[in-house]
Amino acid sequence: MVAPSETQIVQAVKAKLESGLTSTSDVVREDEVRRLLATLELEHDWQDIAVKKFISILCKHSLMPVSKPNDGCTSRSTSCPGGKKKKKSKTDTSIPKSFIDPTISFPAGIRGVYFDPVKGKGLVATRSFSKGDLLFTEDAYIPTPPPEAFDQMASGQLCAQCFLPISSAPVALAIKNCSKCKHRFCTTACYKTAMATHHTLLCTGINASAKPLIELIERQKWQSLHCVARSLARLLMTLTRQYHGQANKKADTQDSVATYGDFETVYARLSSFATVSELERRSRNPGWTTEKASFESILVEAHTALCNALDPYSSTRNANLEPFHVSADYLDSTRKPLIKDLFCLATFMKLVGRANINMEKFGGLYSLHSFLNHSCSPNLEIRHVPERAILSSMKVAAIALCDIHPDDELVISYIDPNTSLARRQLLLYRDYCFGPCTCDKCTTQLGALGLVYDPAKHAVKAFLDSVAHKTRPDPDHTLPPTSQDSTLEDQLRASLGF
């Protein structure tokens, strides 16, 4: 993580004001300070900055109006009437952080909203939708194959970009084979996209240093690690000569920058996904104490393999292997610290956590889909869009489950909403690092148990323990565990992405 200078903070705030992220273009309003700070911390991976210091810098540089003395607390002081002091604000690392990437285009009738640092971002309807309406379709920003498809993709049976069967290719002559490995692509479009966003850096025939990483992913069927690798490859591809058309002067050379974005655009998009350390997720697993040592060991192995494969500054890169494709011409002084930080172990833990809490159930990171918050009474469902009479694993559609009105938040269910209250709360807490869920359904069921969640009074884990205790069966009438109960631990481990 980076400790920003005052100049860096000022420059970043001015850039946000100019981009229209705030409601005014010249100053930051008091009610926008915390949201802006959370956004900048995540986007630039800054160390936690006290709100007091942030406000002081904004006021000093006339980026925020100074509060009047009779407003209670001034922006330059933590002193309040009665001699009390405000508690220093620090970001809770157990809560996933996200922000809205201003380059995202929202479909008609939908807007993106940043609610607060805890809930993060979401989607809200700006017009009415009827039950069954299609609200949007979306292709994966980072396509990642389902674990069961790894072997078929590696052997060339499935397209390495869209993961549809090669045999279903619309035109046999359009099938493209990688000349350096067994990966195949079902169309010219899939081939061009893959080469521009990941395959050039992850192909073991082109980048021999990537072989241990790919072997680890395939051996462990480690989907979240594969997602991290493809995410970083997409970012680093923006720093290659091929990406900028310098390696191929043909007239039909694809303008990759215009199609897929430059370094800053891709970095901002990836950073905007909700992010939390994988260690935070793992620590909520009931078997964490037992598996901690072995898991941390394989994480270090994965981190080492990732750095050897993709880190432009890795000291362990084999100089005798084919030259790395990232060009020093594009590694300027601004990008260098960002890239170095991306490959440190702590950031790697965050990248794995980001992949696990954002990937759609079949894999892949989706820009709009990642905005959707959870409710046990969802008004949307996500379906996969058929292509060539086959359900495409990397294209989704959002369908209204009921009538939706203007200003309604668009929500999906991350889990099976028909399971018990205690089980839903448990899975959401462990898999998605939030809770307790207080949607209408949960609030009603909690109320029936005499429970009302108050964040000012209740610690999350203690409250969830109360829910479990209240819903526990009478010990005098306990039945033998069902197959569903006995596999809960297995399901939890699977849902943790490893």
Curated annotation (Swiss-Prot):
Q: Which UniProt keywords apply?
A: Chromosome, Cytoplasm, Methyltransferase, Nucleus, S-adenosyl-L-methionine, Transferase
Query: What PROSITE patterns does the database record attribute to this sequence?
Result: SET
> Which cell locations does it reside in?
Nucleus; Chromosome; Cytoplasm
EC number(s) given by UniProt:
2.1.1.-
Give the reaction(s) catalysed. Answer: L-lysyl-[histone] + S-adenosyl-L-methionine = N(6)-methyl-L-lysyl-[histone] + S-adenosyl-L-homocysteine + H(+)
Q: Under which name does UniProt file this protein?
A: Histone-lysine N-methyltransferase SET5
Record's family?
Belongs to the class V-like SAM-binding methyltransferase superfamily. Histone-lysine methyltransferase family. SET5 subfamily.
The family database entries (InterPro entries) matched by this protein are listed as: SET_dom, SET_dom_sf
Which GO terms are recorded in the biological process aspect for this UniProt protein? methylation; negative regulation of gene expression, epigenetic
Q: Which organism is it from?
A: Mycosarcoma maydis
**Gene Ontology cellular component annotations, sorted alphabetically:** chromosome; cytoplasm; nucleus
Annotated region Disordered: the residues are: 68-94
Any one GO MF term held by the record is: histone H4K20 methyltransferase activity
| Main location class | nucleus
Annotated SET domain residues: 108-415
Instruction: State whether keyword Cytoplasm applies.
Output: yes
Question: CDD domains under this entry?
Answer: SET_SMYD
Protein task: Histone methyltransferase that monomethylates 'Lys-5', 'Lys-8' and 'Lys-12' of histone H4 (H4K5me1, H4K8me1 and H4K12me1, respectively), thereby controlling gene expression and remodeling chromatin structures.
Under Gene3D superfamilies, the record lists: 1.10.220.160, 6.10.140.2220, SET domain (2.170.270.10)
Point out the coiled-coil segments of this chain. Answer: none
